[in-house]
Amino acid sequence: MNVFVTSTCPVKSAEYLDNKRCNKMLLESAQLLCTAINVHGGKAPYKTSHLNHPSNVWCRATRANWDWLFRHYLALCSEYTRRYGKIHKSSLIQSELLSQRHLIPDGELTPFANCARNLSKGVDYTHEKDVTLAYQLYLSDRWETDAREPEWT
């Protein structure tokens, strides 16, 4: 469970992801948005998952956080369709999510959670104060044989 914040712009953040994470983060974003709705009394299409993960805590803390992640989720849906020529199943819950947005507490955008770490792979950028840089470094270290080079390099 994570939000790879490679840019403060939710659309660019989605565009910058490699193919593997584009697919994975679309599902995880949907799960985070659903968990926030469930925690605040709604009935989301996906069950609550990883309740106390820092990304989950961040998502449900304020409506501005939830809105940022929703825009990122929409961008991931578009990016997935552009890259693969098909619609991801998690794209189909957009209206259900949006109809329960009002349940999320009002508030400003708070600092992104920095979870840029995978100790089994020897990658840890959680000490980095600039969260977007932390995720860029994390992904650069883990970039596999994707055809595209990271756009920030």
Task: Label each PLM-derived region with a short phrase.
Residues 101-153:
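Aromatic-residue-lined binding/catalytic grooves and analogous aromatic/hydrophobic interfacial grooves
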Residues 91-105:
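Domain-level detector for trafficking modules
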Residues 8, 20, 57, 77, ...:
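Generic alpha-helical secondary structure signal
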Residues 3-4, 11-12, 94-98, 139:
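Generic preference for hydrophobic/aromatic residues in regular secondary structure cores
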Residues 19-22, 26, 62-65, 69, ...:
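Intrinsic-disorder-associated interaction segments
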Residues 16, 46, 73, 80, ...:
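Sequence-level detector for tyrosine residue identity
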Residues 38-83, 89-93:
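Amphipathic alpha-helical packing elements
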